[in-house]
Amino acid sequence: MSQQVIIFDTTLRDGEQALQASLSVKEKLQIALALERMGVDVMEVGFPVSSPGDFESVQSIARTIKNSRVCALARCVEKDIDVAAESLKVAEAFRIHTFIATSPMHIATKLRSTLDEVIERAIYMVKRARNYTDDVEFSCEDAGRTPIADLARVVEAAINAGATTINIPDTVGYTMPFEYANIISGLYDRVPNIDKAIISVHTHDDLGIAVGNALAAVHAGARQVEGAMNGIGERAGNCALEEVIMAIKVRKDIMNVHTNINHHEIWRTSQTVSQICNMPIPANKAIVGTGAFAHSSGIHQDGVLKNRENYEIMTPESIGLNQVQLNLTSRSGRAAVKHRMEEMGYQESDYNLDHLYDAFLKLADKKGQVFDYDLEALAFINKQQEEPEHFRLDYFSVQSGSSDIATASIKLVCGDEIKTEAANGNGPVDAIYQAINRVTNYNIDLVKYGLSAKGHGKDALGQVDIVVDYNGRRFHGVGLATDIVESSAKAMVHVLNNIWRAAEVEKELQRKAQNKENNKETV
């Protein structure tokens, strides 16, 4: 019988480090729920000591997620471990993941320490983490460049101290697959107590071989793989979990292992991460790219028509990509929309039916037929904007021509007030943004603007994603409409609401901190 490979997702911790704009607590919860539905065994959701916001998001996810083990990162520092435990204690069970560098370069130049001191510190911190939970993971940072004898000493000591998972990361993406396999097998040969812990691997894609390294390590005995959906992460990214998962499934004949992942949720989880993180998936991306199952060669097309297995080693359906697209019209009722969402695998908690149906009717009146991809796009926007809005675009009008200066007029609802403004700009989108800035007096700099079609044909929905800089922080906004100028305006209003909510959260955190301080003084 094949052994299980534990899937450890770090999209919300290591993956988030690559994003241009930080995710809100709500956005992180959306991703966490998608990962839970996909069946990841462990999800690393943040570094709680880094900021009050990260602490809050880890705590919220730990309180919500029930079917995956929630994990938080901590350096081998007492405060890190204590804060991680505090953020996770609302969960029924949790993991603390602590780490320290073990390579000669890192020990000498970063830690300015010795291997013996590193081992002593690792032992102390693993034991401290065990005071809070019986699920402790220890990572040897830069293990790929650590001599095997040194690595074996650290691993043996960490296991003796109580670590239940030992992670061997290729921190800088330097190791070749055959080298990585040798490291894993070398540890099995050298560490006498290695059977008391799960050996994990964490790979980076600097040389384009993160997935190959992970699979080589699994073949050599590793039984946990760490990575991120779509391979997102700093520098060249992390190991793409969907690729590892499907490689294990498709090549079970030689891998002789399995995962507990619900493969039919891979596509939707990948799309959720892509859209919320504002990181488009390349068309030629393995498993989840739009071209992953496309065949343009005549010979290939003929072979697929005769037998799909001629050129397809897996089916689109195996990752949850439904190629049968149905359409609804303005005559379709709420029950029909709800039924179609259920057929596509969505749960009622994934969207607000009232809001979705209102948006559906408006779109159906404009374009006649609404397809599955339209519904999914509407549901995504619906989820992003379901919180109460302080700002709302009530009206806009734009005048623009090839030789005219673009002029925009807007009516913006700001809390209990309605404000109107007009402005000129370098094109219709810039004119609207200038008018909005005049209303709010927010000093916003547009950093990135992206437009993507959600569907096919001239009446396809256009999704605009923008990233702005405001007071040294970056915020992401998204808008959706058949009119790209309207999409652009909605994206900026979404940004305004995100800025406003962030300010409200900051006020609440300050209030809690002040109350805590007052309570201390009272005691």
Swiss-Prot record:
Cofactor(s) listed: Mn(2+)
Enzyme Commission designation: 2.3.3.13
Annotated metabolic or biological route of this protein: Amino-acid biosynthesis; L-leucine biosynthesis; L-leucine from 3-methyl-2-oxobutanoate: step 1/4
Regulatory domain: annotated segments: 392-523
Binding of Mn(2+), residues: D14, H202, H204, N238
Domain Pyruvate carboxyltransferase: 5-267
GO annotation (BP), single: L-leucine biosynthetic process
Enzyme class, spelled out: transferase
Protein name: 2-isopropylmalate synthase
Record organism: Klebsiella pneumoniae (strain 342)
Organism phylogeny: Bacteria, Pseudomonadati, Pseudomonadota, Gammaproteobacteria, Enterobacterales
